């Protein structure tokens, strides 16, 4: 699946148990992991350009109020109308996990205040945005933020700080790019800082 396969933790547990019992493979194809910029970040990270991750950020901001009735088909029972703010972290957190190859071992979630407009559009909880602070299996910390915060156009942003440098997405007049910073092997104050 490309979107959330479960609406509740109970459904998520049921999916995991079914996979374990049957021995089948379940593939969750989080599409933001395979976009050009995040794929390039993955490639450079795997080549060791910035060392091991020490801190990272993933951001997916999409104020979808204008298209809400279209994507929920106006159905008050549609899964999006009952989604907890921290459940849709796939676009913000998925690429960070894919880029670094590290797994979360501890997660603390927060939600921002509900958005009044979304109550009128059918969302039972006001479609608040979610934030997660995640500890990875190597001890690194990740901040993930996602949801319907007010801004246009929608934005995704990824930053990975490593033991030897930095990789991050950025946008300028020429479009979106990946920024790479690498410490010099001979002098820590001299560095390579470029767009790739």
Place the predicted regions along the sequence by residue.
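Active-site beta-strand termini and strand-to-loop segments that position acidic
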Residues: 125-127, 132-139, 160-163
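Predominantly a Rossmann-like dinucleotide-binding segment in NAD(P)-dependent oxidoreductases
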Residues: 24-25, 32-125
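C-terminal glycine/acidic-rich active-site capping loop/insertion
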Residues: 31, 136, 159, 164-196
């Amino acid at each position: 699946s490309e979107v959330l396969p479960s609406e509740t933790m109970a459904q998520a547990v049921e999916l995991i148990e079914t996979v374990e019992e049957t021995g089948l493979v379940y593939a969750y194809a989080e599409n933001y992991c395979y976009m050009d910029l995040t794929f390039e970040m993955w490639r450079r990270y795997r080549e060791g350009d910035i060392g091991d991750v020490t801190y990272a950020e993933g951001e997916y901001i999409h104020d979808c109020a204008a298209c809400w009735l279209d994507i929920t088909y106006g159905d008050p029972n549609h899964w999006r109308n009952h989604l907890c703010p921290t459940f849709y972290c796939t676009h913000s957190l998925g690429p960070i996990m894919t880029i670094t190859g590290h797994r979360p071992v501890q997660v603390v979630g927060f939600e921002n205040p509900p958005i009044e407009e979304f109550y009128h559009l059918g969302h039972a909880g006001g479609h608040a945005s979610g934030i997660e602070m995640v500890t990875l299996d190597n001890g690194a910390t990740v901040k993930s933020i996602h949801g319907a915060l007010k801004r246009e156009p929608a934005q995704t942003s990824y930053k990975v700080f490593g033991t030897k440098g930095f990789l991050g997405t950025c946008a300028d007049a020429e479009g979106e790019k990946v920024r790479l910073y690498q410490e010099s092997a001979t002098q820590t104050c001299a560095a390579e800082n470029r767009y790739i």
